[in-house]
A protein has these predicted regions:
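Surface-exposed, low-complexity/disordered segments
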Residues: 1-111, 122-124, 184-306
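Extended beta-strand-rich segments in extracellular/periplasmic secretory proteins, especially
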Residues: 92-148, 152-159
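Amphipathic hydrophobic-ligand
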Residues: 110, 137-143, 169-177, 208-211
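Transmembrane beta-strand segments that form the barrel wall of outer-membrane beta-barrel proteins
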Residues: 131, 159-164, 299-306
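Beta-turn initiation residues at beta-strand->coil junctions
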Residues: 133, 159-162, 194-199
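A broad structural signal for short, well-ordered beta-strand segments within beta-sheet-rich domains
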Residues: 140, 155, 171, 188-192, ...
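Extended lipid/amphipathic-ligand handling interfaces
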Residues: 143-149, 175-185
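Beta-strand-rich interaction surfaces with strong enrichment in secreted/lumenal proteins
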Residues: 165-166, 179
């Protein structure tokens, strides 16, 4: 959203759109939050025999997705595009492409590194390095590494950026910030994993900024009950995951919602009151879902088309 756009179109006609605009903490650009999804989960891992399962304890969402039957529409799209990033892998699979990790085995021949300074990161002395692809035409990251200045040479923090010139479809910019902490037993673990992507699907049409913030905590290396690994599937969804209270989310939420994110339900209710909005959603449903409801929440229909 630009200051010019704030003075025309829907922002001028419906002032509550302008009231919903905020400054992104990730890019410092003005944005209009339209969707938010929170997931609280627990991951268990066994080395031998190898097994890993994720138990989803709570899911909370609000925003534009509520108007579609496929309520996880945006989440499904993003899951298909994004994947977890492990900088300790030799290659990073992201945006349906493969990138050389800045600390992978092939990194030295792919990237150029520059020693910048010695800095403090969370009270730990670190060596600050920057890196760029050896060949500016190569498909790779630019970024910063903060390496602990001791015998471990562990990565304390890593930031990676995918420049627009890289040529990934629809992606104007992508930023990844990861931070690590050392456990009492000496192991280093990932604690913060933030990804921000700016998408532009059609030139001249308002783009999207998507933020994925992941926090890891409560690491425990004690033995896990064997029965948990006998649960079927790699992802287990608790029966009441969609019915968690506000008190539950207040207790597990590690990043507080912004004022505008907290106001999402009110904002969506006001959008529903806009004349003609239901026809826009009707057309969008037909296009996106290939399915059209003939009823409403208050008056469900026995017949749908799809």
């Amino acid at each position: 959203v630009t200051p010019e756009k704030m003075e025309k179109g829907i922002y001028k006609k419906f002032s509550f759109f302008k009231d919903q605009v905020e400054v992104s903490p990730k890019t410092n650009k003005m944005i209009l939050p339209i969707s938010i999804k929170e997931t609280s989960s627990k991951t268990i891992y066994r080395k031998s025999p190898k097994s890993e399962k994720t138990i989803i304890e709570g899911v909370n969402s609000s925003g534009i997705e509520e108007f579609f039957n496929t309520g996880d529409m945006l989440g499904t799209i993003l899951t298909d595009v994004f994947s977890d990033v492990n900088i300790y892998d030799d290659d990073i699979r992201l945006l349906q492409r493969r990138f050389v990790s800045p600390i992978g085995r092939g990194a030295i021949s792919f990237y150029k590194y520059y020693l910048m300074d010695t800095v403090m990161v969370d009270r730990q002395e670190c060596v600050h390095l920057t890196f760029v692809p050896q060949n500016s035409q190569d498909f790779g990251f630019t970024g910063h590494l903060y390496v602990v200045k001791d015998s471990t040479y562990a990565v304390k923090k890593c930031t990676m950026n995918l420049p627009k010139k890289t040529g990934v479809n629809f992606v104007d910019n992508l930023d990844i910030v990861q931070q690590f902490e050392q456990m009492p037993d000496g192991n280093w673990v990932l604690t913060d994993d933030d990804m921000t992507v700016e998408l532009q699907f059609v030139k001249g049409i308002q783009g999207l900024e998507v933020q994925r913030t992941t926090k890891y905590s409560n690491y425990n290396f004690e033995d896990i009950e064997p029965r948990l690994f006998r649960l079927k599937g790699n992802v287990i969804k608790e029966a009441n995951m969609l019915n968690k209270s506000d008190e539950y989310w207040a207790s597990v939420r590690q990043v507080p919602l912004t004022k505008k994110e907290s106001n999402m339900d009110v904002f969506m209710n006001r959008i529903e009151q806009i004349p003609g909005f239901k026809y826009v959603i009707f057309g969008a449903k037909a296009l996106i879902e290939n399915f059209v409801e003939t009823g409403s929440k208050k008056h469900p229909s026995k017949f749908d088309f799809g």
